[in-house]
Design a protein with these regions (language model features):
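A structural signal for small-residue-enriched, beta-sheet-centric alpha/beta enzyme cores
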Residues: 1-90, 94, 100-408
Length: 408
């Protein structure tokens, strides 16, 4: 059984965190811009990265440091992507070296991430100068997780953190995470930053398998704006301090751990979709009756990624034709004459399309349903028994404003 707990990225035994303003963000000294997460013990570690061909320097460094499947710490900055910029990998390595010196481990045991403006040289010297102070703030507390969560935010309006507890092999295991993501988010992994910590004892091979499986059903099922970033990374550290027998293969223990990890990541993914830049609505699209799960996911992704559908939800307009249109260009084969569509929220549910044809419906009720903060598009395909749920958000005037002056 999975239970929700407090503590965020510090919920698991042996993990400490900190966040501090060191000067990467020059426009606001009150905004933290560097985060540090450290384990008291060596960790099995894994990560999944952006599929964008243009990858930021920290991704190359982190991939190299993960070659042995082990790590001790994560250092991350916001305000500068360290992508397509001079001395990118050198500066990423300098961040790792500074963190390693401050906490007492090898530079290759530190994973590094960046997020922010692309194409500008990272002021790595201010990170180096602030690292000792940042390390001095490390502690295992909810406040420390909160500080780290805020330190990786860019256009986010709220922090994203969560933690769960479960039982693995008779031992209490905790998993916590922090994430950032508000724009440049599209389901294709990776599409954000997410740092996960756990005290579960699990091999590097199995923690990677669990992360890949989990990303597929969580972060790969969200979309804000259709853009896949150059930097985005989801990583996990597992230090084994829970004391369970090390998971080295599939079985009951692995299934229990995987269930908890998926629950955590789905919650974080929903937080990111809900906090899309300028968004007013969280959109859930559930496609049922598909021929298989992959088909259902492709169609649901297409619907939540549709700019016209997003605009309709922003306007509280039950324009179901845009849903069918997005389904039709998804690349999946299906019979439109079998499709049913309904809109739902806390205010109720209203069918708007049956067997590919529009229904007469109460426009006022539909508007009330779509006025809620969280709305659902329910699609039935009539092609099989498979289903999938994806998450997105509406598009508003504020999205244009935020991104029109992002660099200023």
């Amino acid at each position: 059984m999975v239970s929700w707990i407090d503590g965020g990225v510090c919920a698991a035994q042996g993990f400490r965190a900190a966040g501090l303003h060191v000067g990467v963000k020059t426009h606001n000294v009150n905004k933290k811009d560097v985060a540090l997460i450290v384990s008291d013990a060596d960790c099995a570690a894994a990560a999944v990265f952006t599929t964008n061909v243009v990858k930021a320097a920290p991704i190359h460094v982190t991939k190299a440091h993960l070659a042995n499947g082990r790590a001790r710490a994560v250092v991350a900055n916001s305000g500068n992507a360290n992508a397509c910029a001079p001395l990118g990998e050198e500066n990423a390595k300098r961040m790792c070296a500074a963190a390693a010196k401050a906490i007492g481990c090898g530079a290759e045991d530190v994973l590094v991430c960046s997020t922010g403006v692309i194409g500008q040289t990272l002021r790595v010297n201010v990170i180096e100068e602030g690292m000792e102070e940042l390390a001095s703030l490390l502690e295992r507390s909810g406040a420390a997780s909160d500080a780290a969560a805020h330190a990786i935010m860019t256009t986010d309006t709220v922090k994203k953190e969560a933690a769960v507890e479960t039982t693995v092999g008779g031992k209490t295991v905790r998993i916590g995470g922090i994430a950032k993501g508000s724009g440049m988010i599209h389901p294709n992994m990776g599409t954000m930053l997410c740092f996960i910590t756990t005290d579960c004892a699990i091999s590097p091979e199995m923690i990677r398998e669990a992360l890949v499986d989990t990303a597929h059903v969580s972060f790969n099922r969200i979309s804000v704006d259709g853009d896949t970033s150059t930097n985005d990374t989801c990583l996990v550290l597992a230090n084994g301090l829970a004391g369970n027998e090390t998971i080295t293969g599939e079985g009951e223990d692995y299934a229990a751990f995987l269930e908890a990890l998926k629950a955590l990541c789905v919650r974080l993914a929903r937080m990111m979709a809900k906090d899309g830049e300028g968004a007013r609505h969280l959109i859930t699209c559930t496609v049922a009756g598909a021929k298989d799960e992959e088909s259902a996911q492709t169609i649901a992704k297409s619907v939540i990624s549709s700019t016209l559908t997003k605009a309709a939800i922003f306007g509280c307009d039950a324009n179901w034709g845009r849903v069918l249109c997005a389904m039709g260009y998804s690349g999946e084969e299906f019979d439109p004459d079998k499709v049913d569509v309904a809109f739902a929220s806390a205010a109720g549910e209203i069918p708007v399309c049956r067997q590919g044809r529009g229904l007469d419906f109460d426009e006022d009720l539909a508007k009330r349903i779509l006025t809620e903060d969280e709305v659902e598009i329910r699609v039935r395909m009539g092609e099989g028994d498979a289903a999938c749920t994806c998450w997105g958000c509406d598009i508003t005037y504020d999205y244009i404003k935020i991104n029109g002056d992002y660099r200023t």
